[in-house]
Design a protein with these regions (language model features):
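Structured, helix-rich domain cores that form ligand/interaction pockets
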Residues: 1-262
Length: 263
C-alpha cells in the first residue's frame, strides 16, 4: 500500500554522516577492503558521494552529499544544515529493483527494522504515496478513457509506451490511476494511487503529523485504505455501456454534458 516516501529532516544524522564521511575519505576499493562483511555489503550496494573537504585548501564543499541504499537516497545539505531521505520503500524491500509485487504491512515492518539505524520513530513524513491494485475484467485502459474529474479537477490522460495513466492534481495531493498490466505480466490490473505532498491532507487522521512510528501501526494502514476508498468513490467517470436509447431527455443531457466537470 505504501510506496514512495520523503522525510525532510532525519534525526539520526550522525549515523548517516558516518557512512557518508567514511565512504568519501577513502576510495571505494579502500572502503571495501577495510570494513567487515556487513560494511562491504552496504558499500557495494549503495554509498556514493562527492568530496566534503578539499584536502589542499581545507575549504568545505557546497555540494549536496548523497548516499544511495537499495534505491533510497539520503541527502546531506551543505554545512550540515539538514539530512533527508526519499525513495520507494517497496523497491527497497526488493533490493531496489522493482515494485510490481505485493508490499504488505509485514513487508514494511521488515523494511523498518532494516532502516532502524537511519530513520528515527519520531521522524516526520513530508511526502507519501499510498495505493492499491484492482483486478479488472476488462483492459484498464478502457476505464482510463472514461475518467472525467475528481472534485472538479479534470483528469489528464497520459499515454506512454510503457504506461497509460490519468492524473488529477490538487494543492495538497495528486490522484494517479494507471494501467499496471504491463508490470503484472499482462494480468489486467488497475492501480489507484494518492501522492500526498502536503500533510494537511492527513490532519483529521493524524492531527500531530505523520511520523515513521505511525507507519509501523496497523491502524494507520487501515486509515490509508479508508482514505483511498473514499478518494476513489469521489471520482466522476462515464459508463460507456449505457444504452442511450432507453434514457429520458434529462438523463441523456447528463450523459452528453457529464464530461464537463463544471456541469
Amino acid at each position: 500500500m505504501i510506496d514512495f516516501i520523503k522525510v525532510e529532516e532525519l534525526a539520526n544524522k550522525d549515523r548517516i554522516r558516518e557512512l557518508l564521511d567514511f565512504g568519501m575519505e577513502l576510495t571505494r576499493e579502500e572502503v571495501v577492503n577495510c570494513v567487515g562483511p556487513e560494511g562491504q555489503k552496504h558499500i557495494k550496494e549503495s554509498f556514493e558521494s562527492g568530496i566534503v573537504v578539499n584536502k589542499t585548501t581545507g575549504e568545505l564543499s557546497q555540494r549536496k552529499r548523497h548516499a544511495r541504499l537499495k534505491g533510497l537516497i539520503f541527502t546531506l545539505i551543505p554545512g550540515g544544515r539538514g539530512m533527508r531521505m526519499q525513495g520507494s520503500l517497496h523497491k527497497f524491500s526488493n533490493g531496489g529493483e522493482k515494485n510490481n509485487d505485493r508490499f504488505t504491512f509485514d513487508d514494511f515492518l521488515a523494511v523498518a527494522e532494516e532502516l532502524e539505524d537511519y530513520i528515527s520513530p519520531r521522524d516526520r513524513i513530508n511526502v507519501i504515496e499510498i495505493g492499491l491494485n484492482v483486478r479488472t475484467p476488462y483492459p484498464p485502459g478502457h476505464f482510463l478513457k472514461s475518467l472525467i474529474c475528481h472534485k472538479g479537477n479534470r483528469f489528464n490522460l497520459i499515454d506512454l509506451w510503457d504506461e497509460k495513466r490519468a492524473e488529477a492534481w490538487h494543492k495538497q495531493y495528486r490522484i494517479k490511476i494507471y494501467d499496471k498490466s504491463l508490470h503484472q505480466g499482462g494480468e489486467k490490473t488497475l492501480r489507484v494511487e494518492v501522492r500526498v505532498n502536503k500533510m494537511q491532507w492527513f490532519r483529521s487522521s493524524f492531527p500531530e503529523g505523520l511520523t515513521w512510528a505511525d507507519l509501523q501501526r496497523p491502524e494507520s494502514w487501515a486509515t490509508f485504505g479508508q482514505l483511498l476508498l473514499r478518494t476513489f468513490s469521489e471520482v466522476l467517470y462515464y459508463d460507456p455501456t449505457i444504452n442511450k436509447a432507453n434514457l429520458s431527455p434529462a438523463e441523456l443531457r447528463i450523459i452528453e454534458e457529464g464530461n464537463n466537470p463544471i456541469y
